[in-house]
Amino acid sequence: MQRIVTVLCLILGFLLLAVLVAIPAHNVTPALAQEAPKTASPAEGYNIHVLAPHLVDGKQMGPYHHYCKVMAPDPQIVCLIYESTEPNAVLSQVEWIYAKKMTRAAVPLKEWNKNWHDHAVEIAGGRVQVLDLPPDKAKEVADTVATTDGMIYHFYFDGKLPNGKTSIAQAVGHKPLTESEYKASGK
């Protein structure tokens, strides 16, 4: 009896596989996928374009193209970061940006000095460019971001494949803060 059940399961499995192989995948191609009806998704809205170099393993690299999205008005921002503006550029970093009042209240100074950076310092260093916006709007973006701290995750690749390694990249010009500077600047 058990052999009959096993044989029937195998037959049903092969029939199911044959049916799945016979069903066309509606000829889905990248071009057709782009033409599909658009619905709201988390991937929309990364349209603030910023250019800035980073320190990766202590070496200045980039400049990197940040495509940023405001997630909350206090502000909370996420940036997808690429080495170029090519349509198929590889995502090489992600930056989380939060209002100083949030980070300074929650992150211990030692951890902040190691992993976070102050955008006011980075912007004042003159290496950050807000692209694709008129000068008055670019200044507005820079002024808002100057009220925040950022943490950048860098992804490592072996050739074209990610290897699973990450590190915290740092802003060029990052300055560790003293306890009193940290407390005073988080208000």
What spans do the regions from the language model cover?
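Positively charged n-region of N-terminal signal peptides that target proteins for export
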Residues: 1-4
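Bacterial N-terminal signal peptides
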Residues: 9-25
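Cleavable N-terminal signal peptides
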Residues: 25, 30-31
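Primary mode marks residue(s) on the alpha4-beta5-alpha5 output face of response regulator receiver
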Residues: 32-80, 86-187
